[in-house]
């Protein structure tokens, strides 16, 4: 069993019921972000699943230089602070440099380390020194057993508020696969593990100037991951994925979330009997 991590009023790991980290890929604007958060809260309250709201203020690794990146750190954190205050929900976003750590930590309940940056020692240590909960996305290039070294960098700061997230492994060009063995391997570090169900079905750079995705496989992989014992599920959602400014092809439609979460909750209940 992993240690229990507390994020606001949400508890992850330690045998607790499945938690959800969800929200749009990127903050498109204040109105849409608040509307998405309100809808997710309503859905999660109805199903009985705890929510951490996620949204990126800057998508710093978009495929094309012309792709929409978000409102930037200052405006994005303002919007996330408003979501947190209005709904009482914990909030999560990515940090990309040491300079972002301190201002982000003033607002965010969880500092997320992007997959491409998961081995950057200075960033991990700076994040760890805040004492905040740190969610590290496992790089697409990293073996699951290598995450113990990532954990060691953060825990060296006397910070054990660590969550690890599986988001698929590179499989040739423009493709990812999920190795279900990674869940027990990563959980053997003693920290909770979350499955990023939507980035795992991404086709990186698969559309030339943007990434593609296979949304139709999100449910299948999510069900398998919950059956394998993950502590939480990470999903990017959107009212109209076809109109999303980032990662639409692999985002889940908000209308589809209630039925999906009910299935995942039922599987989790069986696993944790």
Curated annotation (Swiss-Prot):
Keywords: Cytoplasm, Lipopolysaccharide biosynthesis, Transferase. Signal peptide: none annotated. Its main location: cytoplasm. Pfam families: DAHP_synth_1. One of its GO terms (cellular component) is cytoplasm. Its EC number is 2.5.1.55. It catalyses: D-arabinose 5-phosphate + phosphoenolpyruvate + H2O = 3-deoxy-alpha-D-manno-2-octulosonate-8-phosphate + phosphate. It comes from the Bacteria. It is found in: Cytoplasm. The keyword Chloroplast does not apply. It is an enzyme of class 2 (transferase). The keyword tRNA processing does not apply. One of its GO terms (biological process) is keto-3-deoxy-D-manno-octulosonic acid biosynthetic process. SUPFAM superfamilies: Aldolase. One of its GO terms (molecular function) is 3-deoxy-8-phosphooctulonate synthase activity. Pathway: Carbohydrate biosynthesis; 3-deoxy-D-manno-octulosonate biosynthesis; 3-deoxy-D-manno-octulosonate from D-ribulose 5-phosphate: step 2/3; Bacterial outer membrane biogenesis; lipopolysaccharide biosynthesis. Belongs to the KdsA family. This is 2-dehydro-3-deoxyphosphooctonate aldolase.
């Amino acid at each position: 069993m992993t240690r229990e991590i507390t994020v606001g009023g949400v508890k992850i790991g330690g045998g607790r019921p499945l938690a959800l980290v969800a929200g749009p890929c990127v903050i498109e604007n204040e109105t849409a972000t608040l509307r998405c958060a309100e809808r997710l809260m309503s859905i999660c309250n109805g199903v009985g699943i705890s929510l951490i709201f996620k949204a990126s203020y800057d998508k710093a690794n978009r495929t094309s230089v012309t792709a929409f990146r978000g409102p930037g750190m200052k405006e994005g954190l303002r919007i996330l602070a408003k979501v947190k205050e209005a709904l009482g929900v914990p909030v999560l976003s990515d940090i990309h440099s040491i300079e972002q750590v301190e201002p982000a930590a003033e607002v965010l309940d969880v500092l997320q380390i992007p997959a491409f940056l998961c081995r950057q020692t200075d960033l991990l240590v700076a994040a760890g020194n805040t004492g905040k909960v740190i969610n590290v996305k496992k790089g697409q290039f990293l073996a699951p057993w290598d995450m113990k070294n990532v954990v060691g960098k953060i825990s060296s700061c006397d910070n054990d508020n660590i969550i690890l997230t599986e988001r698929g492994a590179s499989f040739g060009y423009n493709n990812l696969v999920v190795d279900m063995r990674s869940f027990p391997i990563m959980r053997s570090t003693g920290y909770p593990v979350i499955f990023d169900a939507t980035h795992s079905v991404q086709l990186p750079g698969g559309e030339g100037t943007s990434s593609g995705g296979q949304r139709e496989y999100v449910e299948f992989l999510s069900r398998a991951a919950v059956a394998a014992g993950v502590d939480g599920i990470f999903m990017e959602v959107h009212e109209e994925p076809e109109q999303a400014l980032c990662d639409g092809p692999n985002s889940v439609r908000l209308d589809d979330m209630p039925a999906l979460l009910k299935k995942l909750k039922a599987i989790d209940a069986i696993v944790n009997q």
